Amino acid sequence: MYTSGYAHRASSFSSAASKIVRVSTENTTAGLISEVVYREDQPMMTQLLLLPLLQQLGQQSRWQLWLTPQQKLSREWVQASGLPLTKVMQISQLSPCHTVESMVRALRTGNYSVVIGWLADDLTEEEHAELVDAANEGNAMGFIMRPVSASSHATRQLSGLKIHSNLYH
């Protein structure tokens, strides 16, 4: 049976195109930056929301980095929460400007499945964009933890881009 050279070229083009599509989908990244606003008097609500995700991410070979302002993670709490003690790293007592900078560096490396940082103030658009780029580059998740007091929460405007843990009673 005779096939024209055009038909052969079309099938080789189709094969090459499918290889390009396959390579481009393999290289897509799934980084994520999210803010979690929680009430200081209800820290358990935040744990209920985040622990299942952190437990699942703990199954990866990568680390989990906690950038905490002053408090130190309890070894007992980490184990009781079902998080892998051998994959949890903590750096404490960072100033807010160093927290964002450290998050960007850590996310960009790809060594961490998740980077969690505490900030009292809102991110600037530039800081948020920098974090998103770093998370995409490292294929990692970043969580900005923002505590609010019960009294200030009532006057704060709700944003659809933030997770407000007090909505999950």
UniProtKB/Swiss-Prot annotation:
Coiled-coil intervals: none
GO BP: any one term: DNA repair
Spans annotated as FtsZ binding: 106-112
This protein's UniProt keywords: Cell cycle, Cell division, DNA damage, Septation, SOS response
InterPro entries in alphabetical order: Cell_div_suppressor_SulA, P-loop_NTPase, SulA_CellDiv_inhibitor, SulA_enterobact
Region listing for Lon protease binding, in residue ranges: 162-169
Pfam families xref list: SulA
Modifications the protein undergoes after translation, according to the UniProt entry: Is rapidly cleaved and degraded by the Lon protease once DNA damage is repaired.
The keyword DNA damage is annotated on this UniProt entry: yes
Keyword Cell division among UniProt keywords: yes
Free-text function comment from the UniProt entry: Component of the SOS system and an inhibitor of cell division. Accumulation of SulA causes rapid cessation of cell division and the appearance of long, non-septate filaments. In the presence of GTP, binds a polymerization-competent form of FtsZ in a 1:1 ratio, thus inhibiting FtsZ polymerization and therefore preventing it from participating in the assembly of the Z ring. This mechanism prevents the premature segregation of damaged DNA to daughter cells during cell division.
Record text on subunit structure and interactions: Interacts with FtsZ.
Family, per entry: Belongs to the SulA family.
Stated name of the protein: Cell division inhibitor SulA
Designated gene of the protein: sulA
